[in-house]
Amino acid sequence: MHDAYYNSDNTLVEATTKIGLAAEKLFGAVFNDYAEYRSANADAGRCIIENGDGTLSMSSGRLQLGANIVSDTFGFAIGETDEAKCPIAVSGRVLAYPLEDITMYTPGAAVCSGPEGTISLMTREEIKEWPDAIVGYVSEIPTYDTWGSDNVPVNGRIWIKIK
Protein backbone atom coordinates (compact mmCIF):
# COMPACT_ATOMS: atom_id res chain seq x y z
CA MET A 1 0.00 0.00 0.00
CA HIS A 2 1.41 3.42 -0.91
CA ASP A 3 0.18 6.74 0.49
CA ALA A 4 1.32 10.30 -0.07
CA TYR A 5 0.33 13.45 1.76
CA TYR A 6 1.61 16.97 2.44
CA ASN A 7 3.05 18.12 5.77
CA SER A 8 2.09 21.44 7.32
CA ASP A 9 5.15 23.01 5.62
CA ASN A 10 3.93 21.78 2.19
CA THR A 11 6.62 19.12 1.83
CA LEU A 12 5.52 15.88 0.24
CA VAL A 13 5.65 12.88 2.54
CA GLU A 14 5.36 9.35 1.21
CA ALA A 15 4.59 6.32 3.30
CA THR A 16 4.63 2.70 2.28
CA THR A 17 2.95 -0.01 4.29
CA LYS A 18 3.41 -3.68 3.59
CA ILE A 19 0.59 -5.93 4.71
CA GLY A 20 0.95 -9.67 4.58
CA LEU A 21 -1.88 -12.17 4.82
CA ALA A 22 -1.64 -15.92 4.79
CA ALA A 23 -4.77 -18.03 4.94
CA GLU A 24 -5.96 -21.37 3.68
CA LYS A 25 -9.31 -19.78 2.86
CA LEU A 26 -10.40 -16.15 3.00
CA PHE A 27 -14.17 -15.65 3.22
CA GLY A 28 -15.76 -12.48 1.97
CA ALA A 29 -12.71 -11.25 0.08
CA VAL A 30 -14.73 -10.37 -3.00
CA PHE A 31 -18.31 -11.40 -2.36
CA ASN A 32 -21.09 -9.09 -1.21
CA ASP A 33 -23.43 -11.97 -0.42
CA TYR A 34 -24.35 -12.11 3.27
CA ALA A 35 -25.88 -14.96 5.26
CA GLU A 36 -27.14 -15.37 8.81
CA TYR A 37 -26.82 -18.70 10.57
CA ARG A 38 -30.09 -20.03 11.94
CA SER A 39 -31.25 -23.21 13.57
CA ALA A 40 -32.83 -25.15 10.70
CA ASN A 41 -32.48 -28.43 8.88
CA ALA A 42 -32.59 -27.70 5.15
CA ASP A 43 -30.31 -28.18 2.17
CA ALA A 44 -28.71 -25.28 0.33
CA GLY A 45 -30.99 -23.84 -2.34
CA ARG A 46 -34.18 -24.65 -0.44
CA CYS A 47 -36.78 -22.04 0.46
CA ILE A 48 -37.64 -21.96 4.15
CA ILE A 49 -40.31 -20.05 6.07
CA GLU A 50 -40.18 -18.12 9.36
CA ASN A 51 -42.70 -19.69 11.76
CA GLY A 52 -42.89 -16.63 14.01
CA ASP A 53 -41.43 -18.34 17.07
CA GLY A 54 -37.78 -18.32 16.00
CA THR A 55 -38.05 -21.61 14.12
CA LEU A 56 -37.93 -22.23 10.38
CA SER A 57 -39.71 -24.79 8.19
CA MET A 58 -39.40 -25.87 4.58
CA SER A 59 -41.83 -23.93 2.38
CA SER A 60 -44.91 -26.00 1.59
CA GLY A 61 -46.70 -23.78 -0.90
CA ARG A 62 -46.70 -20.64 -2.96
CA LEU A 63 -46.91 -17.08 -1.59
CA GLN A 64 -45.95 -17.96 1.99
CA LEU A 65 -44.75 -14.95 3.97
CA GLY A 66 -41.39 -14.81 5.74
CA ALA A 67 -39.58 -16.83 3.08
CA ASN A 68 -35.78 -17.19 2.94
CA ILE A 69 -33.32 -19.27 0.93
CA VAL A 70 -30.57 -21.48 2.39
CA SER A 71 -27.19 -20.48 0.92
CA ASP A 72 -24.01 -22.29 -0.02
CA THR A 73 -22.68 -19.34 -2.06
CA PHE A 74 -22.28 -16.59 0.58
CA GLY A 75 -19.12 -14.57 1.10
CA PHE A 76 -19.85 -13.42 4.66
CA ALA A 77 -21.92 -15.07 7.40
CA ILE A 78 -22.69 -14.19 11.00
CA GLY A 79 -24.27 -15.85 14.01
CA GLU A 80 -22.95 -19.41 13.87
CA THR A 81 -23.48 -21.23 17.18
CA ASP A 82 -23.77 -24.85 18.27
CA GLU A 83 -27.47 -24.74 17.33
CA ALA A 84 -27.38 -22.25 14.43
CA LYS A 85 -25.59 -24.00 11.56
CA CYS A 86 -27.86 -23.28 8.58
CA PRO A 87 -26.79 -20.20 6.51
CA ILE A 88 -29.80 -18.18 5.33
CA ALA A 89 -29.21 -15.65 2.51
CA VAL A 90 -29.72 -12.08 3.75
CA SER A 91 -28.44 -10.11 0.75
CA GLY A 92 -26.78 -10.64 -2.59
CA ARG A 93 -27.39 -13.66 -4.79
CA VAL A 94 -28.16 -17.25 -3.92
CA LEU A 95 -28.76 -20.43 -5.92
CA ALA A 96 -32.32 -21.74 -5.45
CA TYR A 97 -34.36 -24.68 -6.73
CA PRO A 98 -37.13 -23.59 -9.13
CA LEU A 99 -40.64 -25.08 -9.14
CA GLU A 100 -41.43 -24.40 -12.78
CA ASP A 101 -39.44 -25.51 -15.82
CA ILE A 102 -36.17 -23.59 -15.85
CA THR A 103 -36.89 -22.24 -19.35
CA MET A 104 -39.82 -20.22 -17.96
CA TYR A 105 -37.51 -18.06 -15.80
CA THR A 106 -36.11 -14.76 -17.08
CA PRO A 107 -33.84 -12.24 -15.36
CA GLY A 108 -35.80 -9.70 -13.34
CA ALA A 109 -38.83 -11.94 -12.75
CA ALA A 110 -40.14 -11.89 -9.16
CA VAL A 111 -40.24 -15.17 -7.24
CA CYS A 112 -42.00 -16.36 -4.09
CA SER A 113 -41.95 -19.55 -2.02
CA GLY A 114 -43.06 -22.78 -3.63
CA PRO A 115 -43.91 -26.30 -2.47
CA GLU A 116 -41.19 -28.61 -1.12
CA GLY A 117 -38.70 -25.79 -0.58
CA THR A 118 -38.72 -24.45 -4.12
CA ILE A 119 -39.14 -20.91 -5.42
CA SER A 120 -41.94 -20.09 -7.84
CA LEU A 121 -42.56 -17.44 -10.49
CA MET A 122 -45.08 -14.75 -9.54
CA THR A 123 -47.70 -13.32 -11.87
CA ARG A 124 -48.16 -9.54 -12.22
CA GLU A 125 -51.39 -9.84 -10.23
CA GLU A 126 -49.64 -11.73 -7.41
CA ILE A 127 -46.87 -9.11 -7.28
CA LYS A 128 -49.49 -6.37 -6.86
CA GLU A 129 -51.62 -8.31 -4.37
CA TRP A 130 -48.83 -9.90 -2.29
CA PRO A 131 -45.64 -7.81 -2.63
CA ASP A 132 -44.59 -9.00 0.83
CA ALA A 133 -44.37 -12.56 -0.52
CA ILE A 134 -41.55 -11.67 -2.93
CA VAL A 135 -38.37 -13.52 -1.95
CA GLY A 136 -36.25 -11.98 -4.69
CA TYR A 137 -35.75 -11.63 -8.41
CA VAL A 138 -34.24 -13.97 -11.00
CA SER A 139 -30.68 -12.89 -11.68
CA GLU A 140 -29.23 -15.60 -13.92
CA ILE A 141 -30.00 -19.02 -15.36
CA PRO A 142 -26.69 -20.91 -15.09
CA THR A 143 -25.38 -22.85 -18.06
CA TYR A 144 -22.55 -24.35 -16.00
CA ASP A 145 -22.45 -27.29 -13.58
CA THR A 146 -20.37 -25.80 -10.76
CA TRP A 147 -19.75 -22.31 -9.44
CA GLY A 148 -16.84 -20.61 -7.67
CA SER A 149 -13.44 -21.72 -6.49
CA ASP A 150 -15.07 -24.30 -4.20
CA ASN A 151 -16.91 -25.81 -7.20
CA VAL A 152 -20.36 -25.47 -5.60
CA PRO A 153 -22.72 -27.81 -7.53
CA VAL A 154 -25.47 -25.88 -9.36
CA ASN A 155 -27.78 -28.95 -9.53
CA GLY A 156 -30.48 -27.30 -11.66
CA ARG A 157 -30.71 -24.24 -9.41
CA ILE A 158 -31.01 -20.65 -10.62
CA TRP A 159 -29.57 -17.41 -9.25
CA ILE A 160 -31.94 -15.27 -7.19
CA LYS A 161 -31.11 -11.71 -6.11
CA ILE A 162 -32.45 -11.47 -2.55
CA LYS A 163 -35.06 -8.76 -1.96
Positions of predicted regions on the chain:
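Extracellular receptor-binding modules and their adjoining Ser/Thr/Gly/Asp/Asn-rich linkers
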Residues: 1-163
